[in-house]
C-alpha cells in the first residue's frame, strides 16, 4: 500500500489485515472457479472505505476447486504476519449457501468468551462477513446460484501463532484471521486495547467475578516470584490501565486488583490513566507533593524532584524518615483515584519496586487478593 499516516511526526505506511487477505483470496478464487479464467489481481473494498488492488499469488485451478493466496502487507507496523501468504480454497457444493471454515494454520477456538464459538475456526466476525459478501458479489456477477465451500488457510500460521496471544486465549493450531476495518494502522493502540478486551471478556464469560491486572513483565514477575501466583492468571494491561478498568466495569466484574511497579502506578495518583511516557512523566512531582504533605521541604524537596528513578526517591524518603508516611499517603491517593474512575466496582492496588520490594497497598487490596485466589 502507498497510503500513510503521520504519527508522532513520522510518516508511516498503512497495511492491510489478514481479514482483507482472506476476503480478497476468497473473492479471486471464487471468480476463477465460476468463470474458468485466471485472475492475477483483485480489488477489495475494505470496511474502512479504502479500496485495495492486490496481487493474486500461487494459483491452483481445477474444474472442481481453485486455490490462491494474497500476501499480507503490514505496512510499517511490526506485525509478525508480515509477508505471510493467506490462502483461500473454494469449491462448489450441492447445498445452497456459502460455508466458511479454517484450514491449515488457522486456529481453532477451544475456550468460550471469544469472537467465535468453541470449535469454530478463529476467523473473526468482520473477516467472515467480508468473505461472505465478496464471494456473494462474485456469484451475483456470474449468475451462480449454487453453494460454495470456502477454506481459509495460512501454512505458516501454526509457527507464527506461538508468538501471539492465541495459546493464552485458548486458540490452538494457528493464527486468527482478524481485522475490523480491513486496514492496519502502524503501532495502533486500539489493537492492543482490543486484545485486552478479548482476554477480559473470556475471563468474565468463564465465570470470574474478580480479575488480577498487571501492567507488564515486572508485575508478572512479582506476582510469580513474591506472591506465588501463576502470572497467567493476570491480564496484562500494558499502559492502558484506565481503559482496562473501564472495560472491567462494562463487562460486569465485581472487582479488580492492580499489581505493579511504583514507576507505573504512581502516575495513577495524578489521574494519568495511560501511563506511557509520551503522555507525561509526573512521577517525581507526585512523590514530592506527597512528601511535602508529610513535611518534606526545602533542599530535600528540590533533590527529590531531580531524582532519576522512583527507587532514588524512596532512598531519599528513608533518609528523611518519611518512607512509610509518604507511601501510605500515596496509596490513599491512588485508592481515591481508582474509586473515582470506577466507583461501582471494588478496586485495589499493590505497589512494589525492584530494589525495595513490597511498598504499599490500597485499603481494599488484601481482600481483593483473597477473592481472586478463591474465584
Predicted regions and their residues:
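Generic N-terminal targeting/processing segments that precede catalytic cores or assembly contacts
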Residues: 1-163, 167-169, 364
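N-terminal charge/polar-biased segments
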Residues: 1-18, 32, 36-39, 140-141, ...
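Surface-exposed flexible segments
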Residues: 85-87, 226-229, 362-368
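A structural signal for small-residue-enriched, beta-sheet-centric alpha/beta enzyme cores
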Residues: 3-6, 13, 169-175, 180-199, ...
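Flexible, glycine-rich phosphate/dinucleotide-binding loops
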Residues: 159, 220, 358
Amino acid at each position: 500500500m502507498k497510503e500513510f499516516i503521520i504519527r508522532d511526526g513520522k510518516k508511516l505506511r498503512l497495511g492491510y489485515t489478514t481479514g482483507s487477505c482472506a476476503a480478497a483470496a476468497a473473492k479471486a478464487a471464487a471468480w476463477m472457479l465460476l468463470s474458468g479464467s485466471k485472475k492475477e489481481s483483485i480489488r477489495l473494498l475494505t470496511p474502512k472505505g479504502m479500496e485495495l488492488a492486490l496481487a493474486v499469488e500461487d494459483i491452483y485451478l481445477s474444474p472442481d476447486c481453485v486455490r490462491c493466496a494474497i500476501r499480507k502487507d503490514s505496512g510499517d507496523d511490526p506485525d509478525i504476519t508480515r509477508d505471510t501468504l493467506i490462502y483461500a480454497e473454494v469449491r462448489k457444493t450441492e447445498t445452497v449457501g456459502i460455508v466458511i471454515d479454517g484450514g491449515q494454520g488457522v486456529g481453532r477456538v477451544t475456550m468460550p468468551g471469544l469472537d467465535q464459538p468453541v470449535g469454530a475456526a478463529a476467523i473473526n466476525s468482520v473477516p467472515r462477513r467480508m468473505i461472505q459478501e465478496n464471494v456473494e458479489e462474485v456469484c451475483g456477477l456470474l449468475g451462480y446460484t449454487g453453494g460454495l465451500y470456502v477454506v481459509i488457510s495460512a501454512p505458516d500460521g501454526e509457527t507464527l501463532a506461538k508468538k501471539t496471544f492465541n495459546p493464552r486465549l485458548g486458540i490452538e493450531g494457528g493464527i486468527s484471521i482478524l481485522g475490523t476495518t480491513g486496514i492496519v494502522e502502524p503501532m495502533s493502540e486500539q489493537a492492543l486495547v482490543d486484545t485486552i478486551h478479548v482476554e477480559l471478556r473470556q475471563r468474565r464469560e468463564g465465570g470470574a467475578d474478580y480479575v488480577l491486572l498487571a501492567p507488564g513483565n515486572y508485575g508478572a514477575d512479582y506476582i510469580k516470584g513474591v506472591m506465588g501466583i501463576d502470572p497467567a492468571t493476570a491480564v496484562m494491561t500494558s499502559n492502558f490501565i484506565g481503559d482496562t478498568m473501564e472495560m472491567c466495569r462494562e463487562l460486569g466484574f465485581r472487582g479488580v486488583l492492580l499489581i505493579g511497579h511504583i514507576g507505573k502506578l504512581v502516575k495513577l495518583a495524578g489521574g494519568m490513566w495511560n501511563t506511557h511516557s509520551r503522555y507525561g512523566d509526573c512521577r517525581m512531582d507526585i512523590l514530592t507533593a506527597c512528601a511535602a504533605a508529610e513535611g518534606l521541604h526545602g533542599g530535600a524537596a528540590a533533590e527529590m524532584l531531580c531524582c532519576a528513578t522512583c527507587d532514588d526517591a524512596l532512598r531519599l524518603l528513608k533518609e528523611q524518615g518519611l518512607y512509610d508516611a509518604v507511601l501510605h499517603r500515596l496509596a490513599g491517593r491512588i485508592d481515591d483515584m481508582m474509586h473515582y474512575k470506577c466507583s461501582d466496582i471494588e478496586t485495589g492496588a499493590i505497589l512494589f519496586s525492584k530494589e525495595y520490594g513490597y511498598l504499599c497497598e490500597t485499603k481494599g487490596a488484601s481482600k481483593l487478593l483473597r477473592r481472586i485466589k478463591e474465584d
